[in-house]
Amino acid sequence: MLKKYRYKCHFLSDLKQFARILFQSAIAKRDQFSYDLDVESPYKIDGARIKWPNLIQGTLIKRYKRFMADVKLRNGHVVTAHCPNTGSMLECSEPGRPVYLSRHNNPKRKLKYTWEMIEMPGSLVGTNTMVPNKLVKASIEAEKVPEWTGFDSIRSEVKYGQNSRIDLLLEKGDCRCFVEIKNCTLVMDGVAIFPDAVTSRGLKHLVELQDQVRMGDRSVMFYLVQRMDAKLFRPADHIDPAYGKELRKAVENGVEVLAYDVSLDLEGIRLNRTIPVKV
């Protein structure tokens, strides 16, 4: 009996170790696929606009393992593209839909293609979550965001909170504005909603933004709707009620909420207009 117990303990220990190795391997592969829009990439920032490289059209076969998508190109070839989107992409990853890919020549990348957009009824939808931070920063620097003018510096990925990094930190003298940016792709009946899946990380960011307000800083939750068919923004209470509850609490505690849509075509993307927010 004791021998069997020891064997079971060793088996469970080995199983946990194996699961840990698989998880670390998945994270490493994800990091290998990451890239910067400013370094060794074909993207160009022109004022407040990000210009796409020559996009390649195809048809989505399937998205899998979260970061991969098989796409059939117009020439009949099937390629595997990097899907830079950690969300569920609810209603934005339907097989058979037209998609647009960029090609990257960085020799360090295992996947040479990146999934940039999908064509949905009524609008193109930007699927690349690397785009929003760069686009918002470029728009602020070009003074295209009237809510944020007069700041002396804009820094990205600044450490704050509980081992977190704020997307943008705007500063002028002693005044600091913490900006957290979320990519929104889900629209239902003209209403943009976030999140498209339960997000403990997003919940943590809301708590940390409130902490900054208590310390005398300005905090903003910015939702970038990467499509052109939304007339209103609200939290997705039916998907993640805890997030919606915390967002309303954050607003009560002084966190500002801002939503913008984009102007999006096969040439590039830019901020378009503010969308009313209903929390």
Question: Predicted regions span which residues?
Answer:
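Short, positively charged and aromatic/hydrophobic N-terminal segments
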Residues: Y7-H10, Q17-R20, Q24-I27, Y35-D46
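Acidic-basic catalytic patches of nuclease active cores, encompassing PD-(D/E)XK
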Residues: L90, S123-R155
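Domain-level recognition of nuclease-like catalytic cores that cleave nucleotide substrates
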Residues: Q226-V279
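OB-fold/S1-family single-stranded nucleic acid-binding modules
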Residues: R109-P121
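Nucleic-acid nuclease catalytic cores
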Residues: M188-S200, V207-I239, D261
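Conserved catalytic cores of phosphodiester-cleaving nucleases, focusing on short active-site segments
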Residues: G58, I166-D196, L209
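Short aromatic-glycine-enriched beta-strand elements
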Residues: R66-D70
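Short nucleic-acid-contacting surface segments enriched for D/E, G, S/T with interspersed K/R
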Residues: G87-V99
